[in-house]
C-alpha cells in the first residue's frame, strides 16, 4: 500500500494518484461541537510540504467519491483506500463519541451516498490515541442506527500515536475490532528507531487473535534507502510524500518478485501471505 501523505486539497488527489499512490491520507479537523469541518493540517507539518491547505470536509468526500466510483468520468481505478487522520487530541470521551457519530453520518451522506452509487474505496480511521476509543463506538453505533451496518465491512482502524502495542491490542479486544492496521512513525524531518515497528510486525506475524494486527505501515518515509530498509522489515504499507519513489523501488529486482501494489481485490483486513 503506497499511502500518499497529507492529501488535503482536491487537486492533490490526482497529483498523488499520478505519482503512484493507491491510498491517500487526509486530515480531518473538528469544530467546538465535535463536528468534522475541514481537511486541514496546522503548522508544523512535514519538511518540504506546505501546511495549511484545506477543503471543506464534506466537499472533499464528494470529490473523492467520484474518484473512487467505477463509471464516473474521473474514476481512478488504482485508488482503493482512504485514510482519515482524525485530529482529536485532547477530546473527552463524549467528544470522541460525538465525533465518531458525525464522521459516520458524513461518510454515509457524502461518500457512500446512502447506497446509491457511492465510492468503493476502503476506509481507514486513524484515531490518534486509545483515549479516543469511543470515537469507534460512536461511529459504529451511528451506522447501525441508520441501518447501514454493512459499510462496517469497508472500514478499519489504526491507533496512530505510537502508544504501547499491548495497550492498543487490549482496547481492540474490548471493542471487538477485527479490521486492524498498526502504524509506527514520525515526521520525515526526524529519525526514529525501528524497535516498536519490529514489535508490531512480530505481533502481526505471530498473533492469532481475531482482534489482532492485520497490517503494519510506517510514516512518513521519503528517502530511497529508508524505503528499502522498511520494505525489508516486512511492512504492508508506506506513507510518503513521494509515492513514485516507492513504486520505483517495488520494481527493483530485490522486491519485484515478492511485493506488488495492492489492488481492490486485496482485502486490507486480512494478513498477507506471500
Curated annotation (Swiss-Prot):
Belongs to the arthropod phospholipase D family. Class II subfamily. Its EC number is 4.6.1.-. This is Dermonecrotic toxin LspiSicTox-betaIII1 G. The name 'Dermonecrotic toxin LspiSicTox-betaIII1' has been assigned by Binford et al., 2009 to AC C0JB92 and AC C0JB94, both derived from Loxosceles spinulosa specimens collected in Namibia (Grootfontein) and South Africa (Borakalalo), respectively. To distinguish between these proteins in UniProtKB, the letters G (for Grootfontein) and B (for Borakalalo) have been appended to their names. Dermonecrotic toxins cleave the phosphodiester linkage between the phosphate and headgroup of certain phospholipids (sphingolipid and lysolipid substrates), forming an alcohol (often choline) and a cyclic phosphate. This toxin acts on sphingomyelin (SM). It may also act on ceramide phosphoethanolamine (CPE), lysophosphatidylcholine (LPC) and lysophosphatidylethanolamine (LPE), but not on lysophosphatidylserine (LPS), and lysophosphatidylglycerol (LPG). It acts by transphosphatidylation, releasing exclusively cyclic phosphate products as second products. It is found in: Secreted. One of its GO terms (molecular function) is phosphoric diester hydrolase activity.
